[in-house]
Structures are given as structure tokens and as C-alpha cells.
């Protein structure tokens, strides 16, 4: 099907605008590409710049701690916890930062979160516990 150029251009502009605003509430803290290389100092700089540590990303309902648990390093997780990130906050489907660390992280990240109050027995809406996700991820 043919879409005329003015409509196509308008659609592209709208999609780009939506994509660039997806993580605006929590700044770079919810950007998984940035998160992969972010240091503890980078996290502190974002927080100092006004990024909301408890903001939910519009795509998936994840917080900065969810992103750090998935893509970040243990030092950035500790920086977020020290700044007051809530460990028990879940996504719309009940996944906590501990679930993300279990499914996609490392054993070091997984061990950091229970000591900060993460509940290893918390269940997602699909009834998954973080221990089950850790065992099935093969990363441990």
C-alpha cells in the first residue's frame, strides 16, 4: 500500500518522538545501552542531574533498579540502593529487580539484592519465583 509522503513523514516524526520520550522520566538510568557501561560515578551523576530513581519507564513499567539488575554492574546497583531505590517494586506483571537479576544477571547481582531486602520468594503474575528464574537461566 502507498502512503503519501506528508503522512509518512508525520508518522515517522511521531514514532521518533515517542521513542525518545520512553525513558525521559528516569533519564539514562532506564537506557539499557547506557546501563551496560555505566559506572557508579555515572549513576551518581544521573541522580545528581535530577533523574527520578523511582520513575517507571513507559515501556514495560521498569524502574532504574530493574534496568541495573538486568544490564548493569553490581556497583551501579549498590549506588541505586544507597540512593533509596526500592527493591520490592515490581513491574505491571510483578517482576522485581531480583527477578531481572535472576533471569538476566549474574550471581553477584542476584546475591546483592536479597541483602538489601529483596524477597526470593516473591512471585510474578505468572507465578515465577526468582529462584526458579535463576536456576533456569543457566547463569548460576
Residue ranges and their predicted role:
Residues 57-58, 91, 124:
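Ankyrin repeat boundary/linker residues
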Residues 39-47, 73-81, 106-114, 139-140:
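Ankyrin repeat structural motif
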Residues 23-49, 59-62:
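Intrinsically disordered, low-complexity regulatory segments in ankyrin-centric signaling systems
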Residues 1-10:
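Bacterial N-terminal signal peptides that target proteins for export
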Residues 9-18:
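Bacterial N-terminal signal peptides
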Residues 34-39, 67-73, 100-106, 133-139:
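Ankyrin repeat A-helix N-terminal signature
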Residues 60-61, 94, 127:
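Start-of-repeat signature of ankyrin repeats
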